[in-house]
């Protein structure tokens, strides 16, 4: 490994069009992502062999196709993967941290990350599970409920987020 290894920030968004960045000529305002793109590497010919969130994350995590992970649609990421990118980066001396939606089972499995902070979009698979986002939300909006915005986690329509922008899950994740 080089004396000063490069910093790696991998951002994976659900259902994000490849051209939906200001730096790609889109009128959307995305200054922070544009800066990361200009100072880092912007992949313009990316391809997802399975354009669904959980299978796509499994492919990225393992370096395998959906046919090899067994995830051709929504389902659980295999628990025992031979190779996992976060663990491989750990083995090279990197500190790895996952934040946001993972949709793994069990939900707190780390898949090689040193730490994870989870926002599971309201998905609770174990009685004792509480997402880190919801804990944070309660600290910042006591008595509030992130599910009262009128916008579902997987709605097919857009809407205005009715709470303060600072409380949005995307803001928390970033």
What is each model feature region?
Residues 1-174:
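Formylglycine-dependent sulfatase
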């Amino acid at each position: 490994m080089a004396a000063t290894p490069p910093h790696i920030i991998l951002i994976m968004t659900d259902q994000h069009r490849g051209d939906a960045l200001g730096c790609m000529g889109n009128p959307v305002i995305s200054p922070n992502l544009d800066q990361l793109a200009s100072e880092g590497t912007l992949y313009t010919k990316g391809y997802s062999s399975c354009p669904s969130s959980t299978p796509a994350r499994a492919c990225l995590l393992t370096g395998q196709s959906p046919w090899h992970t067994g995830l051709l649609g929504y389902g659980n990421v295999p628990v025992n993967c031979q190779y996992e990118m976060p663990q491989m980066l750990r083995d090279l001396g990197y500190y790895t941290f996952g934040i946001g939606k993972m949709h793994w089972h069990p939900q707190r499995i780390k898949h090689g990350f040193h730490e994870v902070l989870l926002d599971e979009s309201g998905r609770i698979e174990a009685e004792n599970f509480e997402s880190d986002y919801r804990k944070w939300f309660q600290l910042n909006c006591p008595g509030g409920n992130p599910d009262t915005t009128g916008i579902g986690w997987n709605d097919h329509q857009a809407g205005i987020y009715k709470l303060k922008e600072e409380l949005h899950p995307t803001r928390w994740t970033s």
